[in-house]
Amino acid sequence: KQRDQVLNGENVHPQVMEMIKQAIENQVKIYLPMDDADLDNPRHNWNLDGLRDRYMGWLLTENDLIYRDEEKKELKPEKVSETLYAKAEQICNLREQKFGEDICRELERVILLKNVDTQWMDHIDAMEELQRGIRLRAYGQKDPVVEYRMESYDMFDAMIDAIRENTARMMLTVRLHTQEE
């Protein structure tokens, strides 16, 4: 569907911004999981420094996502996601002010098409590899159809996540230059 929208020249800006938002939210969930089982310290396994390192240099600066200990106690993953997404929006808005809406919409289409095509081709290769390997599972007394179905769903979800993550990273790191530059 997204590929068809791109090829038809449709505006994919809302979808690209949603991909950026979802990619950020996914990373925040990984680095800042809330442990509801540990009611006294649900943040004990947070890796805020790891999250900062992941985005440092292309979305964050040294002064971003710095919290005092008392602030960390009240900090919620949603707030961190909102902060990161606001930075992403700022990058996109500044680019649009500098280069114009038409160029930015074309950039979004090109980046999205490249990522969808690349990830889809990788997915097809991985599915062929899964199909070859699934036959061996029948020897392990596992139903190959069930195994194939479960793994193929997981692989498809991983492909979608990779499209989101790569599109977000490319949209936020690509550098455009004017003819004067």
Each model region followed by its residue ranges:
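Extended, charged helical/alpha-beta scaffold domains that provide interaction surfaces
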Residues: 1-181
